[in-house]
Swiss-Prot record:
Exists in two forms, due to cis-trans isomerization at 56-Cys-hydroxyPro-57. The cis conformation is the major form. This is Contryphan-Lt. Residues 24-54 form a propeptide. It comes from the Eukaryota. The modification D-tryptophan is found at W58. Pfam families: Conotoxin. Its main location: secreted. Expressed by the venom duct. Disulfide bonds join C56-C62. Residues 24-43 are annotated as: Disordered. It comes from Conus litteratus. The cysteine framework is C-C. It is found in: Secreted. The modification Cysteine amide is found at C62.
Amino acid sequence: MGKLTILLLVAAALLSTQVMVQGGGDQPAARNAVPRDDNPDGMSGQFMNVLRRSGCPWEPWCG
């Protein structure tokens, strides 16, 4: 039981240090920032972009 407790404490310490190193917290958005439209063509455009990036198996359909 004691070994399990120590193992859990070490795992928690490692995870917390990893979060502290990688984290940095959420940075507040700039006041003048304009939201970027990542998907201007809607769902169909997003689907076609995925097909183009992954290599569409049927070229006439992909455009």
